[in-house]
Amino acid sequence: MRFSRVVSLVLLLVFTAVLTGAVKASLNDKPVGFASVPTADLPEGTVGGLGGEIVFVRTAEELEKYTTAEGKYVIVVDGTIVFEPKREIKVLSDKTIVGINDAKIVGGGLVIKDAQNVIIRNIHFEGFYMEDDPQGKKYDFDYINAENSHHIWIDHCTFVNGNDGAVDIKKYSNYITVSWCKFVDHDKVSLVGSSDKEDPEQAGQAYKVTYHHNYFKNCIQRMPRIRFGMAHVFNNFYSMGLRTGVSGNVFPIYGVASAMGAKVHVEGNYFMGYGAVMAEAGIAFLPTRIMGPVEGYLTLGEGDAKNKFYYCKEPETRPVEEGKPAFDPHEYYDYTLDPVDDVPKIVVDGAGAGKLVFEDLMSSK
């Protein structure tokens, strides 16, 4: 009976994947980008809680019990978890947090502090927008916040309109990949680097981050904004329109920004501004920006790695050395660019929560 039930579940899983265009996923999947880079303490790069106990959670209390437990865990968010009151919880090292059954975290955020080796996949985050604090000055809630942590992979998650950051990377965090995520109606999407006053030598060795195949829809700024470190931004789709249903900033301002000597390479991305009418009126989206009391470096891909810009302002760039990328990502990891003309369809179809089906979890449930 047990075998028959498992076979039936797997067949249902495959059939559902075919109908919905879902992607088969595994707990053994590896990230692309800086999260894959091996170090002495993590020779295989980011593997999360692989090999640890698999637990299914359905309440905020159950989720926090395992995110704050010592040791390896694969934590499966089954359905919707609502935090009341709204709050953030801590995530310790060696955790994989994945969602099934349209997993949502409502009114809750994850703080990865003084930790390493964390994976978060296939979860929809919402409910952190506070009407009395549209600029995030009072509550400072982030959906995901990494502080003094390394080797983190955030994949196939959706983030909807929070007060402060959707994914913020601070306090010298390092070796992080944000991939195949969807950001909707958010203002300050993703900040890398805590402040201009961080130690430049220490910060310059940290903050290695990859963003690839993400969908930024009607967001305002920081997609991402990087201080000090290195960021590789490739094959993302920026679809900029009016941010509706919220107070605060309404029109998108800029996409990728580099400050405080950061080295940022941007390639194979598709930037779509507000449209012809707005562009003709002089209101246009700035796809890349150089910022800060100390300017950063930012370069654009060439040839097959070119970006595409529609109804945008002229992108701002600043090379470290003329004719060369700000840094060469291939020196750190292997990756393959999708053709830029294919990016909108690939990313819209594939990014965000609810797109992954974990076959290796079916027999564990």
UniProtKB/Swiss-Prot annotation:
Top-level taxon of the source organism: Bacteria
EC class of the enzyme, as a word: lyase
Residues at the catalytic site: R222
Gene field: pelA
Protein name from the UniProt record: Pectate trisaccharide-lyase
GO terms for cellular component: extracellular region
Species this protein is from: Thermotoga sp. (strain RQ2)
Annotated GO MF terms: metal ion binding; pectate lyase activity
Entry-linked Pfam families: Pectate_lyase_4
Protein's cellular compartments: Secreted
Binding-site positions, Ca(2+): D142, D164, D168
Signal peptide: 1-25
InterPro entries: Pec_lyase, Pectin_lyas_fold, Pectin_lyase_fold/virulence, PEL
Keyword Methyltransferase applies: no
Substrates-to-products reaction catalysed: eliminative cleavage of unsaturated trigalacturonate as the major product from the reducing end of polygalacturonic acid/pectate
Reported function: Cleaves unsaturated trigalacturonate from pectin. Activity is highest towards polygalacturonic acid, activity on methylated pectins decreases with an increasing degree of methylation.
GO biological process: cell wall organization; polysaccharide catabolic process
Oligomeric and partner information: Homotetramer.
Sequence similarity: Belongs to the polysaccharide lyase 1 family.
PbH1 repeat feature ranges: 149-171, 261-287
Family annotation (SUPFAM superfamilies): Pectin lyase-like
E.C. number: 4.2.2.22
Keywords, sorted A to Z: Calcium, Carbohydrate metabolism, Cell wall biogenesis/degradation, Lyase, Metal-binding, Polysaccharide degradation, Repeat, Secreted, Signal
